[in-house]
Amino acid sequence: RAIETWREPPDFEKIKKNMFQVAKPDVVYGMFIAEALDKKADYADDEGKKFDFGKMCDRDTQNIWGEHTCEPTFSSREYRGYLKFITRKAIDLGVQSFMFGQIYRQESSMRNYAPEIIRDIRNYAKKKGVDVVIGAQTGSITDAKYLALFDYIEGGVGIDGRGDIESGPCLSRKESCWALLWHPVYAGKAKNVLLHLDWTGVTYDDLDVFARMSQKKRAQTLRNLYSYFVSQDMGFLMPYFGVLDRTNGGCFGPKKRFYSPSDAYSCKDEKAITAIFEGK
């Protein structure tokens, strides 16, 4: 998720400059293909043709993520053209991982567009000699054929204040099914499962719950989650940045609405994360 597209099209000149400044070798860059668009975004392709973001919207999702926003739909020819443009530009820069945010919000009810979109990304990457992986936040989708389109599926773990996870396929404290993708009903049909502390900027999400724990409890929780999911042949992604509810009351990063493990801020989880990766 190094390249974020939430409510904002990717600025490839800025991305190129930032990638050039990263000195560490063999870094794998990823692009997050977000389920949120700004209908008034001013953005054009390399020939100067401007995209019409209003045409990309699911008509029933006006202002769903704030003023002038919507959820895009794969059924829009304009949106598919935009996706082709940004994914190809990213591949040209060497981006190797593409993840669709909450793909069930972008897909049609027939789920018949993802195969075409994914095939185009893979074919272009192959033509350019770039190895890519494609993932998605697939929610409660259990269609084995659909899940098999992706190299990985990704979602939150659903922790409580003790750092424990539940046993069911859906988080019990939500009315609709907030899918726990580590559950066999999903994981058993996917090629790979990546898990993280989910964040949406509300007090009951994974990251806010985590940030309210003591430093010792946070370290223990990360170690337990990492050890458990790796033992289940799944990946657990350590929290390096995320959005918090600014009234959360726990530790935070550079501002109250952001989490950071850096020792420069109040959470100071950096050493605990490093120790886990080093097997200490």
Give, region by region, the residue ranges found by the protein language model:
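Glycan-processing catalytic domains of CAZymes
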Residues: R1-K280
